[in-house]
Amino acid sequence: MLDMNPQETYTAPEEVNTPSRPIDENALLQRHQVMVKRVVNQLRVHATSHCSIEDMQQIGLIALVEAGRRYGDIDDTHFPAFAVCRVRGAILDELRRLDWRSRKTRQQAHELNDVTRDLTRSLGRMPTDSEIIKALGTDEQDYYNRQNAALAGEMQSLDQLMENSTDSHFGGQYDGMEHEHIRRSLDSALGRLSKRDQLLLTLFYQHELNLHEIALVLDLTPPRICQLHKQALKQLNQLMSS
């Protein structure tokens, strides 16, 4: 996952690597295949008959090789963070292309958001899980499935934010120094978020905790975590764009 801890020092290399620099693809795959498996494992809940875990693994490995070719110097210390963005992005793009969230699933996710919002207004606070389940007229398992569906569309948000910022600054061309510039901008923006939002994003993207694990750590309900996650990403996007 993205390492969201700011770098203490940074020295620009004397020579900037170009994306066309030949790479040892076998060494690249051997060195980072565990990272690909870790990304696939985090996204495994979205595997379908149209895109299995094995398919996701293959997509991730191809994206890893493409990331190496584009970046140039796979020995650069900043390459792993760049590669994670590309691997996650490639898998999520394919999942979206295959319409991995069915119309019914999307409708259920919207219904969950609507019910949560209405209960929050009527109660004057965030509703508990049991209150939402009762309002939906469903069971606990369906409720958790709906939460996963609601959160699924945001899984790539932080990675996509970083990629979009890079594209807008450098026209889609990457090297170690340029990618580090974006990483430093992201670190600076993260540092301007509240301590709670920083912790939430760190737990989600760096430590790969799921929604309910983060809720336990922060002593909040899963719906509140979803809300805070969305707000934090919106604020982060504004800070990165300013």
Curated annotation (Swiss-Prot):
PANTHER family per the UniProt record, alphabetical: RNA POLYMERASE SIGMA FACTOR FLIA, SIGMA FACTOR F FLAGELLAR
Its job: Sigma factors are initiation factors that promote the attachment of RNA polymerase to specific initiation sites and are then released. This alternative sigma factor is specific for the flagellin gene (fliC) expression.
Family annotation (InterPro entries): RNA_pol_sigma-70_dom (IPR014284), RNA_pol_sigma70 (IPR000943), RNA_pol_sigma70_r2 (IPR007627), RNA_pol_sigma70_r4 (IPR007630), RNA_pol_sigma_FliA_WhiG (IPR012845), RNA_pol_sigma_r2 (IPR013325), RNA_pol_sigma_r3/r4-like (IPR013324)
NCBIfam families per the UniProt record, alphabetical: FliA_WhiG, PRK06986.1, sigma70-ECF
Keyword Transcription among record annotations: yes
Keyword rRNA processing: no
GO molecular-function term, one example from the UniProt record: sigma factor activity
DNA-binding region: 211-230
Key words, A-Z: DNA-binding, Sigma factor, Transcription, Transcription regulation
Motif Polymerase core binding, residue range(s) on this chain: 55-68
Lineage: Bacteria, Pseudomonadati, Pseudomonadota, Gammaproteobacteria, Vibrionales
GO terms under biological process: DNA-templated transcription initiation
Protein name: RNA polymerase sigma factor for flagellar operon
Annotated SUPFAM superfamilies: Sigma2 domain of RNA polymerase sigma factors, Sigma3 and sigma4 domains of RNA polymerase sigma factors
Family: Belongs to the sigma-70 factor family.
Expression triggers: Under conditions in which the polar flagellum is not functional.
